[in-house]
């Protein structure tokens, strides 16, 4: 009897946790499900929802977007920001929507969550899509800093800024922030030649309802580094194991995404192969906006 009540308590706790999450679905629930996992820590799914979620659903998918616990619209003062916490919330989404399998679409940091979840629960995943996703964090940080050292080789002030970041603890929120702040200041996340379509998508998003809820929890990275030991990882060996386990992996990246080196991209492409890899022209980190038509077309061809 005691074990029965303990089981009941655990089940209740499991589902109660999921209720704190912001979750929104798009499309017909009978279609193939895709769960979108946003970047971060401190991110949210508003840009994806405000520009792309419904259009992806219109391709014949059941799209589920959510904000991770403690991030965006999923406020939770007790959030731990660990991968395990993210896994349990993903499992609660599977339960809530009665999903046996789903495609996991991970963007940026969400790609790490997606990869680690797929490795732990391969039977839950019908396909893993990495979209501008992180996979070798230290190589990304090194690439950002080395690129900028070359760019500013004759600028002592800029070199000093870079050196300060370079000498921080590489397993700290400050180091991560420093690298990405420098990348942002130098246009690493911007497409070089915005198109009429991308300009409209960004402007409509900024004028719309989703932008108003673009909530950023600035404490999220600090708590992630405090609570999560796997805070500077390389998932390529894990991706090989996922592929060997029979889960299809698809990768789509922007040619102008400044946070990845050519060597990184080539190493990733070698894992999945030519037919499961797409490299989009005139496209940076937010590829589902920068080149939305090509992004949607690739996903439809791969997943339908």
Identify the function of each model-found stretch.
Residues 87-102:
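Conserved acidic catalytic loop of the alpha/beta-hydrolase fold
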Residues 283-292:
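Catalytic histidine-centered segment of alpha/beta-hydrolase-like enzymes
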